[in-house]
Structures are given as C-alpha cells and as structure tokens.
C-alpha cells in the first residue's frame, strides 16, 4: 500500500554539523539527486536511510516511494485517510502526506531522491544494529490497526521495560511504544551496548538526561543528534 521505504526525513538547520555527527558514528553519505530546491543530504548504514532537509518539515517524517502516486491516492482515501497535503503539478515531484493516529507524519513520493551507496550487509557503525523506528503512542490498538491497514504486519504486544507492538514491513519496522517519550526515536540494539555507550560518552557526544520509565541507564541511552533527532541505544530488550 505504501510502496518502498525511502528514508526517515528530518529537518536540519545545519546540515554540515549533522553530516559530521552521523559520519563520526560510521554512517556514510548517499548520492542525492536534484528533486529538492534546497540543501539536502542522506546518510545510511545500509538499513537506515536518514534524509537531512534544510527546509522546515514535520520532523521526523517517514517517507516512502510509490510509483503512479496520483492513481494510487484514491486507494489510501478509501481507507479513510485524509491527506494533509497533495501536490500533483506537471512541474513538481508528485507527493502527498498524512498522519497516523499518534500524529506521526507520513509522506509518499512518486520517485526516489537519492541513490544508496553499495554497503556490506554488516557495515559497522558505533551504534549497533538498526532495529526500528520507535513511535510513542497512547493507543496501541488503534495505531496497530492503522499500520496493519497500510500493509505492515502488526505482531502481538511484547512486554519489557514497556509494552510495544512491532509493525513489520519489508524495509522498515515501526515499533509502537506505550512509553513516556516526547518524540519518536531511531532504535539501535547490541548485546554489548553498555560498552558502545561508554565509548560515545568518551568521544563527547550528547545524551538526553532522562530515559523512558523502566529503562536502565546502565545498558540504555538516548543519544541526541545536532538537529535534535533521538537515537535510542539498547541491548535489544525493548
């Protein structure tokens, strides 16, 4: 229903600073096209593709590519989805946007805006394995049904430090978190995450002062990017 996942799109007022941050963690740049008339860059670890946009936009947004978008739009509306915007002019990249029940911004484009670099499946970074886009929600049942209707497979709730439902797609997992987070997170996991966190602290990276309720500060942390993106570092037990 959504197409192929393209990127997590975030607004960055200082793209060079954001690039330096992500490259210091081991992510690499992708070659971008000329779809946008403002500065734009993409970094990736091979699983996560993060689009850095100089233009102000709902941040973070989840962006998919769907060919023949104009013809596909009525199928989304048939699900009861109301578009926040839709642009289908002759001289513009066709795109539309809407939000999920938790307020998460979702965008669909008709074509790609970058070319992924060739990376090994196990490309190493300081962050560990990108597991999912973590989305806080006050209504797990409603959010699960919404993402399931879009073609992701919502599994049974998992218990841990907090309750979550994983809505799994072929190229992105959305973790629906019943937790006290003010913003979505990029969730990375590694059994030895405590050592990774210590290394990042030694290198001077900035962390949020408070973790979600129930999460141990020994094995988990919230890394803060220059543009404000939150990266949740865990042992894989969330």
Give each language-model segment a name:
Residues 4-13, 41-42, 54-129, 134-135, 157-171, 198-238, ...:
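Vicinal oxygen chelate
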Residues 35, 56, 88-91, 179-180, ...:
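A short beta-turn/loop motif at secondary-structure boundaries
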Residues 51-54, 120-124, 174-178:
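Short, flexible, solvent-exposed loop/turn segments with mixed acidic/basic and small polar residues
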């Amino acid at each position: 229903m959504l197409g192929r996942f393209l990127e997590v799109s975030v607004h960055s007022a200082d793209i060079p600073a954001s690039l330096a941050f992500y490259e210091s963690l081991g992510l690499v740049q992708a070659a971008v096209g000329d779809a946008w008339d403002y500065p734009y860059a993409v970094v990736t670890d091979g699983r996560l593709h993060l689009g850095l946009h100089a233009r102000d936009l709902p941040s973070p947004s989840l962006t998919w590519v769907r060919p023949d978008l104009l013809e596909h739009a009525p199928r989304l509306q048939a699900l009861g989805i109301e578009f926040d915007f839709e642009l289908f002019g002759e001289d513009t990249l066709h795109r539309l946007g809407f939000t999920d029940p938790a307020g998460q911004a979702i965008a669909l484009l008709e074509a790609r805006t970058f070319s992924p670099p060739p990376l090994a499946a196990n490309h190493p970074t300081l962050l560990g394995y990108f597991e999912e886009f973590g989305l806080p929600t006050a209504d797990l049942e409603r959010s699960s049904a919404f993402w399931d209707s879009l073609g992701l497979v919502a599994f049974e709730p998992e218990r841990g430090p907090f309750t979550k439902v994983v809505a799994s797609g072929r190229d992105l997992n959305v973790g629906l978190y019943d937790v006290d987070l003010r913003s979505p997170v990029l969730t990375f996991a590694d059994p030895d995450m405590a050592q990774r966190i210590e290394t990042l602290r030694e290198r001077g990276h900035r962390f949020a002062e408070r973790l979600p309720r129930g999460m141990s500060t020994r094995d988990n942390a919230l890394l803060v990017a220059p543009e404000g993106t939150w990266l949740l570092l865990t042992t894989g037990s969330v």
